[in-house]
């Protein structure tokens, strides 16, 4: 079992390579493999196209080595990257309420600048975005498609790199490096289980490699199966997940009911709850119209809501299969081939939902119809199926394919060249249940069911036949596809000599073509009225659907970089990239300096510009999602899920940013390295979809706020726009300390990120310094429910301590997230139950023990471990009708124990 070093250069060229270090990423904890005396590997590192042997830390970097990956106990990439201190506001934990479409995916959000602002690479090559879209309109590369069985390390460049890589590398780059030139066969399997709730997860992995001096093949495969964990196992997470739309009625005239469950006299616009609200699993609440709102005897009453929270999962039942292979072949000493092929199939198999969604048409029921006992018309505020019905499922299925072919060569002059063609695609299917609106209307008037003569009663669920319910029900289907084709060509070598050494140089060109399509089944597809141009709503009571889309575009780029050894201790690197987009063009430079101030001290600084072009989704997409909103006009703190209709725009401009980084690397001993960096991003024309809650708060009766005739909220229209600016800065600190001793080898690693500020424009008066819609607000340390920023705890820290002696290894990992605030008004009743503006700080501990031994000619390792071993609950948060914790930063699963075995043949 080994990974061979394939490309070597004479040791005398090491000094030349060190002088050529440009925007290179120093690979912490990775040493250059020396094969024979006088030979050392030459590598191309993330952030540069100039080959170099330098390990000097010219750029801010964090590297997750293979050893760290093993110590983490992570089964998939999302679990690994979710704990990065430099990532804030990513979506790696399942959440049906605020990231329903992205379930089963994972991503990275460097600096909290948005999922779209982090460039994800696989072996230095671009990967297609997933076809899933986040609630805020973000698109991203699904990192869960990265095969863990083949993952060697993760390199994280924590500064803008548009000058090298082009669009999207605004906040930085995450480069997943996969195994190649592996020899032998390695089998591993593991099982983990949540202590409280019993949901298990197991995986099978196989890694194999074989070859000769010229040709080598590496193959990997894995299977992962996850059992579900219902939110009912964590009651605190859903205690506020209550809809105001359960089963209630609003009288449209004064009247009464003589006998039966609804007997009594009612005034004008009085809310009447389900007569058996509590018995039917409902949640009593205040009426829709305040008492006396339209004069004496009007309004009042109480409604019957629906507690939907326990219906949903915290963890869904999922299965994932992955295959990956690469082939390398040396045609000669000056020409080599690398080919890769990868495939991931991922299914979310259950994903339970509410029995049915509420009817946002709010039907009016006349006396004598739909089983109404009232003598006057009433408006129905509710859902066809409630607590008496089972939960339908909303599965998701995704296939991702990636293929890459690369040729590397050398000219007689010593210059190198690289040409590559990479293709990747994602095909995603999403199912979601709903009720057909026209059929419900027919059934309410007595013309429903297969025979056309059945009546649906909202007053007595037992009166509705299974055949009628099936006739009303509909399973929506959405198929979204993305693909990306990239052609790269790069040349690199020594340009000319300076007194301190040669000038390293690289130049190249890139062509990209991407496409995005979305199609839905018939009833879920919106259409356009040819006469007015208006969107015709779909024939469903709740879900809004979307328009079909099939768009593509291409771009071209030219780039160059050079590294100048100004003196024996000072280097300057200059890079520039020109990109010709389908809608615009951009020139982005980058200047970085590295000064070896002393043997133990490196000072570094960089300044660059960056850009990101609007995604095809942001430009062309039009669809409707569901969001839980609190209506300030209702006078209630309760939330209800309504349609949020988002509209893309062809007028969007690219986002631009100016980035700065200053840092120092201290190496007082060979075993201790300490790094500190100050970073700053000035981000302009940030593309975002309008925040529906913020828009509702700013103007509850605006033109884009949709209400029925009684004023009940049913939808909000939002648009993509270049309306925002972000200025953020902070401090990164990392440290590595190796302590050899007679008792074994001790290792300590620390990674911390602290936001000094995260400033965005004010839109309305709030408690974050805004007095109106002018000026800026600092949203670092806030949950940010009412603006486009995601939740931003000011400080995140990861620390690892490990001890190795003989065949034994113990690792302790600590993860800390600082407290932050909600800014949301909390009802007095919830304050009495312990809710507050503060979201508590959170620290969890993971522990792992491994023992290695031989079984004949087989190397074996047994690993036992625990995650969150002190069983810390996710901090409590009031987020209206959503989960009562922040899934962007906290994990409610609690304590998890696991065991693994690995066999190397």
State what each model feature region is.
Residues 135, 229, 239-244, 279-318, ...:
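Surface-exposed, low-complexity loop segments enriched in small/polar and acidic residues
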Residues 626, 752-764, 768-854, 879:
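C-terminal beta-barrel architecture of Gram-negative outer-membrane proteins
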Residues 36-38, 181-184, 197, 214, ...:
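Short loop/turn motifs that connect adjacent beta-strands in outer-membrane beta-barrel proteins
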Residues 125-158:
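Short acidic/polar hinge/loop motifs at secondary-structure boundaries
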Residues 1-85, 146, 205, 209, ...:
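N-terminal Sec signal peptide and the immediately downstream disordered periplasmic leader
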Residues 437, 756-757, 813-826, 852-905:
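C-terminal beta-signal and adjacent terminal beta-strands/loops
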Residues 81-126:
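Extracytoplasmic beta-strand/coil segments of soluble accessory domains associated
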Residues 77-80, 108-109, 141-144, 168-189, ...:
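N-terminal periplasmic accessory domains that precede
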């Amino acid at each position: 079992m080994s990974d061979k070093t394939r490309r070597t250069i004479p040791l005398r060229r090491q000094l030349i390579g060190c002088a050529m270090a440009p925007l290179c990423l120093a690979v912490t904890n990775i040493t250059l493999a020396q094969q024979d005396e006088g030979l050392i590997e030459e590598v191309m590192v993330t952030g540069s196209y100039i080959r170099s042997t330098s390990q000097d830390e010219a750029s801010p970097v964090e590297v997750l080595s293979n050893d760290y990956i093993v110590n983490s106990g992570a089964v998939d990439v999302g679990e690994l990257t979710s704990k990065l201190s430099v990532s804030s506001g990513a979506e790696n934990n399942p959440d049906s309420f605020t990231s329903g479409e992205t379930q089963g995916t994972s991503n990275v959000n460097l600096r909290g600048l948005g999922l779209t602002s982090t460039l994800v690479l696989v072996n230095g090559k671009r990967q297609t975005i997933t076809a899933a879209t986040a609630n805020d309109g973000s698109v991203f590369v699904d990192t869960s498609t990265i095969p863990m069985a083949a993952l060697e390390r993760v390199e994280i460049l924590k500064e803008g790199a548009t000058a090298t890589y082009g669009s999207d590398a605004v906040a930085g780059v995450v480069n997943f490096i996969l195994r190649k030139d592996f020899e032998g066969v390695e089998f591993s399997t593991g099982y983990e289980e949540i202590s409280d709730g019993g949901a298990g997860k197991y995986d099978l992995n196989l890694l194999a490699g074989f070859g000769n001096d010229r040709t080598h093949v590496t193959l990997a495969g894995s299977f992962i199966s996850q059992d579900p964990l219902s939110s009912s196992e964590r009651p605190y997470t859903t205690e506020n997940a209550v809809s105001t739309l359960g089963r209630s009625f609003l009288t449209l005239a004064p009247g009464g009911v003589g006998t039966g469950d609804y007997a009594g006299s009612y005034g004008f616009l009085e809310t009447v709850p389900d007569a058996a609200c509590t018995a039917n699993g409902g949640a009593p609440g205040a009426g829709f119209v305040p008492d006396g709102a339209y004069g004496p005897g009007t309004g009042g009453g109480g409604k019957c809501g629906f507690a939907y929270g326990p219906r949903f999962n915290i963890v869904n039942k999922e299965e994932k299969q992955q295959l990956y292979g690469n082939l390398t072949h040396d045609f000669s000493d000056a020409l080599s081939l690398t080919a890769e092929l990868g495939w991931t199939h991922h299914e979310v198999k259950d994903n339970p939902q509410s029995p049915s969604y509420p009817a946002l048409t709010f039907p009016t029921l006349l006396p004598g119809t739909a089983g109404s006992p009232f003598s006057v018309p009433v408006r129905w505020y509710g859902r066809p199926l409630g607590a008496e019905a089972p939960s339908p499922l909303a599965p998701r299925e995704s296939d991702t394919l990636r293929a890459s072919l690369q040729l590397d060569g050398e000219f007689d002059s010593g210059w190198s060249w690289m040409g590559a063609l990479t293709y990747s695609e994602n095909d995603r299917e999403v199912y979601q249940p709903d009720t057909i609106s026209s059929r419900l209307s027919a059934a309410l008037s007595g013309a429903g069911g297969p025979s056309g003569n059945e009546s649906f009663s909202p007053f007595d669920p037992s009166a509705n036949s299974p055949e009628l319910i099936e006739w009303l029900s509909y399973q929506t289907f959405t198929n979204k596809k993305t693909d990306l084709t990239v052609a790269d060509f790069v040349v690199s070598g020594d340009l000319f000599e300076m007194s301190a050494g040669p000038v390293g140089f690289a130049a190249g060109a890139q062509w990209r073509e991407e496409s995005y399509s979305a199609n839905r089944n018939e009833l879920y597809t919106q259409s356009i009225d040819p006469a007015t141009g208006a969107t015709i709503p779909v024939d469903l009571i709740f879900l809004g659907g979307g328009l079909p889309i099939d768009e593509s575009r291409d771009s071209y780029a030219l780039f160059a970089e050079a590294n100048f050894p100004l003196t024996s201790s000072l280097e300057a690197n200059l890079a520039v990239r020109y990109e010709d987009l389908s809608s615009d063009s951009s020139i982005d430079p980058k200047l970085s300096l590295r000064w070896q101030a002393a043997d133990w001290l490196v000072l570094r600084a960089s300044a660059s510009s960056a850009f990101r072009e609007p995604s095809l989704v942001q430009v062309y997409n039009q669809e409707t999602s569901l969001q839980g909103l609190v209506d300030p006009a209702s006078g209630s703190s309760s939330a209800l899920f309504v349609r949020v209709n988002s509209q893309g725009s062809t007028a969007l401009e690219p986002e631009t940013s100016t980035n700065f980084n200053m840092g120092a690397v201290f190496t007082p001993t060979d075993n201790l390295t300490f790094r500190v960096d100050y970073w700053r991003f000035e981000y302009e024309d940030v593309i975002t979809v309008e925040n529906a809650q913020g828009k509702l708060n700013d103007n509850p009766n605006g033109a884009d706020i949709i209400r029925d005739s009684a004023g009940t909220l049913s939808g909000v229209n939002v648009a993509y726009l270049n309306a925002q600016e972000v200025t953020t800065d902070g401090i990164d600190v990392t440290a590595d300390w190796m302590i050899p001793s007679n008792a074994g080898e001790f290792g300590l690693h620390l990674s911390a990120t602290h936001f000094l500020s995260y400033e965005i424009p004010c839109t309305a008066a709030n408690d974050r310094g805004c007095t109106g819609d002018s000026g800026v607000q600092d949203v670092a340390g806030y949950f940010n429910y009412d603006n486009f920023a995601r939740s931003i705890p000011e400080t995140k820290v990861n620390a690892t301590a490990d001890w190795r002696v003989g065949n034994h290894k113990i690792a302790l990992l600590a993860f800390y997230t600082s407290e932050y605030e909600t800014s949301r008004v909390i009802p007095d009743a919830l304050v009495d139950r312990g809710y507050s503006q503060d979201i508590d700080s959170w620290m969890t501990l993971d522990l792992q023990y491994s023992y290695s031994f031989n079984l004949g000619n087989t190397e074996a390792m047994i690993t036992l471990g625990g995650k969150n071993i002190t069983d810390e609950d996710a901090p409590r948060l009031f987020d209206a009708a959503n989960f009562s914790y922040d899934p962007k930063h906290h994990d409610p699963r609690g304590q998890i124990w696991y065991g693994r075995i690995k066999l190397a043949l």
